[in-house]
Amino acid sequence: MSDTALIFRLAWDVKKLSFDYTPNWGRGNPNNFIDTVTFPKVLTDKAYTYRVAVSGRNLGVKPSYAVESDGSQKVNFLEYNSGYGIADTNTIQVFVVDPDTNNDFIIAQWN
């Protein structure tokens, strides 16, 4: 199915859908570490969780932070990585996990 066909299929099924999962990566201290990623406008129809993987190593699934009043949501890597940020030389993958099916979908990747 083409991207266009998928979009119009969603428009038919859902009617109104507004989201923005463009990742905003937050650097730590020192600044060669990534501490967070924030998604500007997330889906709120379910209590989605996130799974984080670093260079192919699964760091697990954690409960998500509350959605902010502007619709954004933050994923804090310190909670996945024993209180440490993730070196920006690594590949960081963030997956959103559907609470109904436990299926996960990649939503952001660093490197």
Curated annotation (Swiss-Prot):
Superkingdom, taxonomy of origin: Eukaryota
Transmembrane segments: none
One GO molecular-function entry: carbohydrate binding
Modified-residue entries (N-acetylserine), positions: 2
Gene3D superfamilies given in the database record: Fungal immunomodulatory protein Fve
Record GO biological process: regulation of immune system process
Keyword vocabulary terms for this entry: Acetylation
Family: Belongs to the fungal immunomodulatory protein (FIP) family.
Protein name: Immunomodulatory protein Ling Zhi-8
Species assigned in the record: Ganoderma lucidum
Lineage: Eukaryota, Fungi, Dikarya, Basidiomycota, Agaricomycotina
